[in-house]
Amino acid sequence: MPISAFCSTEEIWQVMMQPNPFIHTTTTGGGALACSAAIAAIRFTLREKLWEQAAAKGEYMIPKLETLAAQYPEIYERITGRGLLIWMHFHNPEVGYKVAAGLFKRGVLVGGTLTNAHTIRIEPPLVIPYELLDKVLDRLSDTLAEVKKTL
């Protein structure tokens, strides 16, 4: 049930239309179920103001991650991010792999960037409750203590 959208400025759109605008069409478009799901998702996003939730939850989460990073300077370079798109930067990919593996073991999914774990991403769903954010932080704290012992 694939669906996608493309938004751009007029300037970018004009470039995309050259030389053949049909290059940027879809082979899976027009599916009624996918379109209905997309409309429902847009309505939910607007009704629940998910962008505001993401901003507030990021303001809650990022300072707590920065505190953890300060407690483990031998592990972290820095924390960056905005809203619920958060990056944890490590001194080297091996440490990032250990942190990611420890989180996976504890049921927390994170993502590497490109082909290594020098930086790993925390990207929870926008509707995640604060209680689960706290669980992520607790599990990260346990993971960091475990990883520190291996350094």
What are these regions (language model features)?
Residues 1-151:
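Conserved N-terminal phosphate-binding loop of PLP-dependent enzymes in the Aspartate aminotransferase
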